[in-house]
């Protein structure tokens, strides 16, 4: 059918890049959502093995979908190479977060926990950092990102030697801050057509 045929406009093939850009953005958003749900479980009062294992699976599935959509985008015409290079770096940091979540899931299953107050403070910082990254993906112009500048510096959350769980959380926060910076740069080079310009993303529940 005509809808399935790519068409050229000004020397650029549009169909696949426009659909793939929207999918890449959606999958990046969904990966962050899965990360958030996992961290909530890990830092909950009484994390249970089955929900932890299920959410770890969802985190890995979401990242794999993101990785696959990036690979597809890199093979298609019409994409800005600088944008793709930035997104590849973003996805690399996402993979590091997956590895930290995998390790923290094991710790939580072994009942390696933080004090309730410290867990709550880390959860708040992680959620703010995750939401900043999601907002960077959701809004159409740099001035509408709704960035929250109340992210507590990770090093102020604890004093003295850090537990293994805290070290993982610190690194997650570091990756999220880097991802926000990367996507702010990539935003100026994003595709300016098609599905990418859908104003708000649908939310996928994990």
Task: Report each predicted region and the residues it spans.
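Long, hydrophobic alpha-helical segments that serve as membrane-spanning/inserting helices
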Residues: 22-87, 105-206
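Pore- and pathway-forming membrane helices of multi-pass small-molecule/ion transporters and channels
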Residues: 1-17
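Membrane-proximal, non-transmembrane interaction modules
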Residues: 92-100, 170, 206
């Amino acid at each position: 059918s005509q809808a399935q045929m790519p068409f050229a406009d000004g020397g650029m093939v549009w169909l696949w890049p426009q659909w793939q850009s929207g999918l890449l953005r959606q999958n990046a958003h969904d990966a962050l959502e899965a990360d958030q749900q996992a961290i909530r479980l890990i830092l909950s009062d009484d994390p249970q093995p089955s929900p932890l294992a299920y959410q770890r699976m969802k985190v890995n599935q979401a990242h794999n979908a993101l990785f696959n959509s990036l690979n597809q985008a890199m093979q298609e015409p019409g994409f800005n190479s600088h944008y793709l290079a930035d997104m590849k770096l973003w996805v690399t940091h996402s993979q590091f977060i997956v590895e930290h979540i995998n390790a923290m899931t094991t710790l939580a299953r072994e009942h390696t926990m933080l004090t309730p107050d410290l867990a709550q403070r880390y959860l708040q910082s992680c959620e703010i950092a995750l939401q900043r990254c999601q907002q960077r993906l959701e809004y159409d112009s740099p001035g509408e990102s709704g960035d929250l500048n109340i992210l507590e510096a990770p090093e102020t959350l604890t004093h003295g030697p850090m537990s293994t769980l805290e070290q993982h959380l610190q690194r997650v926060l570091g990756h999220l801050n880097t991802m926000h910076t990367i996507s702010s740069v990539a935003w100026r080079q994003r595709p300016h057509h098609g599905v990418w310009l859908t104003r708000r993303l649908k939310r996928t529940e994990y």
